[in-house]
Amino acid sequence: MNRFIDLSEEVKSALEERRPVVALESTIISHGMPYPQNIETARALEEIVRENGAVPATIAIIGGKIKIGLNEEELEFMGTSKEILKASKRDLPVVLAKGLNAATTVSATMICANLAGIKVFVTGGIGGVHRGAEETFDISADLQELANTNVAVVCAGAKAILDLPRTLEYLETFGVPVIGFRTEEFPAFYTRESGLKVDYRVEDEVEAAKVIKTKWDLGLKGGILIANPIPEEYALDRAYIEKAIEEAIFEADRRGIRGKALTPFLLEKIKDLTEGKSLKANIELVKNNARVGAKIAVQLNKLYKEA
């Protein structure tokens, strides 16, 4: 195994025994949610993955080591320490070389999962093309990782703070299939609809797993995006959340907040503007993704064992 990687016993034995494993990111713990909801959600996600037949592997960097599968103490540390950096692809070599602590974004988690041989990764929403990117060029590294790294990503679409039409155009340019899980519409994180279409729809986990395996069997590199809408009962009203997003973006512009600080700032501001409703929605959508992601991992694992 790669010298930078430290597998938990649970994950190590699952990989050795060819059991299904699901990667989970840590940015949601350190930068995406406040304490204690962050730790509670992280534990709940792991439990949901187990209940649905797979082994959870929460990924983070602690002391310059890529930890794949965190224990209680490490989860607590990621959720409470103020010393946690946010590591994307470009940050990985520096964080590892300097022995630092960092939460992994979607792009970094995909890289780490791929190094460990984990094929399915569950997150809330991916990063993408930011609003105003035609001037700022602010485009998340998540999109390039989806173009290049063989990991299937289950999400509730892209984060609603982004420019969703341009995000989908970017994914199309780089040949990333955007598959709707029981939906024809690309979900917009807090809402089930965006007015934008996905490329294809699948009806169940078996179909999703077949598409994923077929892509890689063809030798086509890169990921697949499985867009799984937030459950109806937790979805927010589109006009209501859009108003909060626009206010938050205006405030970020006014304060000159850019780069990797932008997304955490916007999520926090939207939480305040919606009196916590956006946080509740965020927690529920990622739990739903964990359910679907674990089931897809189980089916994909079956297909690989049969091959």
UniProtKB/Swiss-Prot annotation:
Originating species: Caldanaerobacter subterraneus subsp. tengcongensis (strain DSM 15242 / JCM 11007 / NBRC 100824 / MB4)
Keywords per UniProt: Glycosidase, Hydrolase, Lyase, Manganese, Metal-binding
Reactions this protein catalyses: D-ribose 5-phosphate + uracil = psi-UMP + H2O
Co-factor remark: Binds 1 Mn(2+) ion per subunit.
GO cellular component, one term: cytoplasm
GO biological process: nucleobase catabolic process
Function: Catalyzes the reversible cleavage of pseudouridine 5'-phosphate (PsiMP) to ribose 5-phosphate and uracil. Functions biologically in the cleavage direction, as part of a pseudouridine degradation pathway.
Record note on quaternary structure: Homotrimer.
EC numbers on record: 4.2.1.70
Name of the gene this protein is made from: psuG
EC class of the enzyme, as a word: lyase
Needed cofactors: Mn(2+)
Residues the entry annotates as binding substrate: 86, 106, 140-142
Cited InterPro entries: Indigdn_synthA-like, PsuG
A Pfam family this chain is assigned to: Indigoidine_A
Protein family (similarity comment): Belongs to the pseudouridine-5'-phosphate glycosidase family.
Catalytic residues as annotated in Swiss-Prot or TrEMBL: 25 (proton donor), 159 (nucleophile)
Gene3D superfamilies: Indigoidine synthase domain
GO molecular function per UniProt: hydrolase activity, acting on glycosyl bonds; metal ion binding; pseudouridylate synthase activity
Binding site for Mn(2+): 138
Protein name: Pseudouridine-5'-phosphate glycosidase
